[in-house]
């Protein structure tokens, strides 16, 4: 069997001094961005977005309108923006275009924030020369209704999606991501920009495996940096640095009078994502580069452990834990990583380790900071760390990228190049005529009497299940084929769940103490079950890898049962898939897994609908009673 355990080749060619005393800072790092031989050989290839962005950095943002781009596909949307995959008409280069509605921005007082984001992106790209690990702006423009930001296209998803898919990473991969994020943050901080919303979702993974820090909607200047205040007017659709403009670039300067040298931070109000927000932001205090370092520490913790350091049942308790620094390292957490994270997750930002000290820390001693943009990134594998007395395991199934796009469909299912791209998630086919399973004899009968016997036998088993099995309420009246407790692992954490393999097919997992259906493993044509040992097995799906452990050491029975059911329902699964591809409902069936917030919002909407219907029914009942009483009075 092929050993796919990653080798230590990605980060170590140069060793830095591991002296990390607080009074010594690492020397400034200059990246070596010289093209490799393979890059030079491709100089005659068609123009790319990277070429055009590099040209715009030198010559200024080109003047464009929405008619200069073909809007091909929506890639996602936020509270007040939507991102599209677009092709520039003149060059055929592919870009991502972020579109914002002016009416929404004005109605919710967000216009100033978007102007600031535009000016920060322009400043980082046009004046600072851009950075390989930071989103670079190609151009921006606006019309009467919308604002457009044109940036480089990244189709490999983000770090948050990869963490959702794989659960956690090994030390080598975690260190790789942390080192590249730190390099990108160093560029921002050297140019007096603080991101203020560092989280896995804002770290994109490029096609070559390197990262890209994105989403500067919460970013701010600090240290006296004065950015252009230019808003969205007809005049600024053309770059101030373009060849047809004689005006100089926006001036930046540092005001020592306004911001003293010893106080380079600025006051702020709470923005960002609660899981990764720093204590100083919660206290409405001074925010500077150390706020981003806090976010980096939370990301590194999650890469290794599988969960963020601060978790709670609700936001109130979550923020309280952050303020009180209430977190702990789970069993099995690497000691070398816990030491550096303990220096990052410090309440007082003035005593928090700095980016320069981080680069010089022994944790990063094998990182070649100068050539980091040219190293080969590690391949992402399904991996479970050593914990609970079990060794670490790497998947022996060939490494694949998270997500289900055209390439993944072609690779997994040989569907061809016309497959629609979408994000994967749970597959819930409606119950169809049962095709048989390994536990119920329902092979197509030769006589009506046999069919009646099979139906009667199934009905009897279903009735016994309804009466005796407390988990029947979760099955939608489907027969349970196999059930049992499994430890569902995610990094260094595990939760005991009751798993139900039922007709349909469905593979459900239940939180037994609270009697709550927590989720369902998706059934897709490319589903794979991998047995690791007598107790551990993996289930590979487009959305994520499930790491499961059977305390009874009967993992092989689970693998066989799941594979048997998958084979028997293969026609149903493939039929549903093909129908979704043909009808354009692929996204709704295999769509991106809903967040807890989205599910809660849907539940509230459902409750409101039910309450409205109940009130309507009550009102109708009252009207009916009133009419009945009136009729009774009129009757002799």
Swiss-Prot record:
Q: Where is this region: PIF-pocket?
A: 100-149
> What Gene Ontology terms for biological process does this UniProt record contain?
cellular response to metal ion; cellular response to reactive oxygen species; dauer larval development; intracellular signal transduction; learning or memory; regulation of chemotaxis; regulation of synaptic assembly at neuromuscular junction
- The catalytic residues are 197
What residue stretch is flagged as signal peptide? none
* Domain Protein kinase residue range list: 69-364
Task: List locations, semicolon-separated.
Answer: Cytoplasm
Stretches assigned to coiled coil? 550-631
What's the Enzyme Commission number for this chain?
2.7.11.1
Which residue ranges are recorded for the region named Disordered?
Answer: 1-45, 233-264, 593-636
Q: Which PROSITE patterns match?
A: PROTEIN_KINASE_DOM (PS50011), PROTEIN_KINASE_ST (PS00108)
Effect in UniProt of substituting residue 305 to V = In mg142; no obvious phenotype
Q: In this UniProt entry, which cysteines form S-S bonds?
A: none
What are its GO cellular component terms?
axon; cytoplasm; neuronal cell body; nucleus
Is the tRNA processing keyword given for this protein? no
Q: Which residues are listed for ATP binding in this entry? A: 79-81, 98, 152-154, 158, 201, 215
Major localization listed first in the record, in broad terms: cytoplasm
Residue stretches of biased makeup (Basic and acidic residues) = 597-624
Instruction: Tell me what the record says results from residue 297 to R.
Output: In sa680; developmental arrest at dauer stage, extended life span, increased body size, low fertility, and defects in egg-laying and social behavior. Fails to avoid NaCl after exposure to NaCl under starvation conditions
Q: Name one Pfam family in it.
A: Pkinase
Query: What top-tier enzyme class does this entry carry?
Result: transferase
Q: How does it assemble?
A: Interacts directly with sgk-1, akt-1 and akt-2.
Instruction: Quote the function comment for this protein.
Output: Involved in the daf-2/insulin receptor-like transduction pathway, which controls longevity and prevents developmental arrest at the dauer stage. Phosphorylates and activates sgk-1, akt-1 and akt-2.
Please state which protein family the record places this protein in: Belongs to the protein kinase superfamily. AGC Ser/Thr protein kinase family. PDPK1 subfamily.
Supply the name of the protein: 3-phosphoinositide-dependent protein kinase 1
Species of the source: Caenorhabditis elegans
């Amino acid at each position: 069997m092929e050993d796919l355990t990653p080798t230590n080749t990605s980060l170590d060619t140069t060793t830095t001094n591991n002296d990390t005393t607080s009074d010594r800072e690492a020397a400034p790092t200059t990246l070596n961005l010289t093209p490799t031989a393979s890059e030079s050989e491709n100089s005659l290839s068609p123009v790319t977005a990277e070429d055009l962005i590099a040209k715009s950095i030198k010559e200024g943002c080109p003047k464009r309108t929405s008619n200069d781009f073909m809007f091909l596909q929506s890639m996602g949307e936020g509270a007040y923006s939507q991102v599209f995959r677009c092709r520039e008409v003149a060059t055929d280069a592919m870009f991502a275009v972020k579109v914002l509605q002016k009416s929404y921005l004005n109605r919710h007082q967000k216009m100033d924030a978007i102007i600031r984001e535009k000016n920060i992106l322009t400043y980082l790209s046009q004046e600072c020369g851009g950075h390989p690990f930071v989103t670079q702006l190609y151009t921006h423009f606006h019309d009467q209704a919308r604002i457009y930001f044109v940036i480089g296209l990244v189709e490999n998803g983000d770090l948050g999606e990869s963490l959702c898919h794989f659960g956690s990473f090994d030390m080598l991969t975690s260190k790789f991501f942390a080192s590249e994020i730190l390099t990108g943050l160093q560029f921002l901080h050297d140019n007096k920009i603080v991101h203020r919303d560092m989280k896995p979702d804002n770290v994109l993974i490029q096609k070559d495996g390197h990262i890209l820090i994105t989403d500067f909607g919460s970013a701010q200047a600090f240290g006296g940096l004065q950015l252009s205040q230019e808003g969205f007017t007809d005049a600024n659709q053309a770059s101030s640095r373009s060849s047809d403009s004689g005006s100089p670039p926006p001036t930046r300067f540092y005001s020592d009078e306004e911001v003293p040298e010893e106080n380079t931070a600025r006051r702020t109000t709470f923005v960002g994502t609660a899981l990764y927000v720093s204590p100083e932001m919660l206290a409405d205090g001074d925010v500077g580069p150390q706020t981003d370092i806090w976010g980096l520490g939370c990301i590194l913790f999650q890469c290794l452990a599988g969960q963020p350091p601060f978790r709670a049942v609700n936001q109130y308790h979550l923020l309280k834990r952050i303020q009180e620094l209430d977190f702990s390292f789970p069993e099995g957490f690497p000691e070398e990583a816990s030491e550096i994270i303990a220096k990052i997750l410090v309440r007082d930002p003035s005593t928090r380790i700095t980016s320069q000290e981080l680069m010089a820390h022994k944790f990063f001693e094998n990182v070649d900071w100068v050539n980091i943009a040219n190293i080969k990134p590690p391949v992402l594998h399904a991996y479970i760390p050593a914990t609970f007395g079990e060794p670490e395991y790497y998947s022996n199934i060939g490494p694949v990228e998270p997500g289900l796009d055209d390439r993944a469909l072609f690779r997994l299912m040989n569907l061809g190049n016309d497959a629609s791209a979408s994000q994967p998630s749970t597959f819930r086919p409606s119950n169809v005529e049962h095709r048989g399973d390994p536990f119920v004899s329902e092979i197509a009968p030769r006589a009506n009497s046999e069919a009646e016997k099979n139906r009667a036998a199934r009905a009897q088993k279903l009735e016994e299940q309804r009466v005796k099995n407390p988990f029947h309420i979760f099955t939608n009246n489907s027969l349970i084929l196999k059930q049992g407790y499994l430890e569902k692992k995610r990094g260094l954490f595990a939760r005991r769940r009751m798993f139900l393999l039922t007709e349909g097919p469905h593979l459900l997992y239940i939180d037994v103490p609270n009697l709550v259906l927590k989720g369902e493993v998706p059934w897709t044509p490319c589903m794979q079950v991998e047995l690791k040992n007598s107790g551990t097995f993996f289930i590979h799906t487009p959305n994520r890898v499930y790491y499961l452990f059977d305390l009874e050491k009967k993992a092989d029975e689970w693998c066989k049962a799941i594979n048997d059911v998958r084979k028997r329902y293969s026609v149903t699964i493939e039929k549903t898939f093909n129908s979704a591809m043909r009808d354009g409902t692929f996204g709704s069936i295999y769509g991106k897994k809903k967040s807890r917030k989205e599910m809660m919002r849907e539940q509230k909407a459902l409750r409101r609908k039910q309450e409205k219907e109940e009130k309507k029914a009550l009102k109708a009942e009252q009207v009916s009673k009133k009419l009945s009483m009136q009729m009774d009075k009129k009757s002799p």
